[in-house]
Amino acid sequence: MEIENSAFQFLTRETAAKFFAECDFTLKQGRHIQQYGADSKLFDYLYDNYEDLAKYYESLFGVYLRKENNEREEYFYLDFPQDGHGRFVKDRYKELDPRHVIFGILLLNVYKERMFEKKEMKWENLEQLFDESESRELWQKLLYGEVKRNYTPNEKDEVKRRAEHTLNLFDKLGWIQWIDPSNIHFEIMPSIDRIAKLYANEIANVELMSEYVHEQAL
């Protein structure tokens, strides 16, 4: 059956020629698309063609195109059936290990605390959370493995290295956007809210996460 007579006639539109391929690739890479920066054109395409695209992904790939919002900021992403499998589409969120999840929970907390403020963060802001926040002992235990008055330069460098690795992954997922990677300067995006949905049990029992991390590391 020719595409003009199919359920996917939207693929013949001029906008599909401009944006569909990039949008499709980006979604299948696990990215959350928001009206921000270079993703704005993809967001507009998804917004205008949401119903058609949702049918397309469910029919052909067995996955679901979701539209959600956080603080009235909308974002799009591909979701998977409960068995975690789609046809020819990899579940990128399964790449997250416990340390990624811990850092994601930290950023989610920061996002919520800064509800009416800019969500920009620098490394010194994160260090301040580790050292001075009300939850500092929890974060120190989760990130360093134990609570101490002082940490060695090597210990701090290792936490920073892991943080950079995690932030690079979160940038690919669309959960943060780099402003200046060389100085660990970034903005937390509305889609960080996905952490709350993917890892609700871990967030509810965050004080047990350190045990989980160390068990996985053995």
State where each predicted segment sits.
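Positively charged, polyanion-binding regions of nucleic-acid-associated proteins
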Residues: 90, 94-120
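Minor-groove-contacting beta-hairpin "wing" of winged helix-turn-helix DNA-binding domains
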Residues: 72-78, 183-190
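Short acidic, hydrophobic short linear motifs in intrinsically disordered regions
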Residues: 30-36, 117-131, 137-155
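Low-complexity, serine/threonine/proline-enriched polar segments
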Residues: 11-18, 122-131, 161-166, 170
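A short, conserved structural fragment
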Residues: 54, 58-68, 166-181
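Short amphipathic alpha-helical interaction segments
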Residues: 45-53, 154-172
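Eukaryotic partner-binding/assembly regions in large regulatory complexes
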Residues: 1-95
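Short, amphipathic alpha-helical interaction segments positioned at domain boundaries
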Residues: 91, 192-218
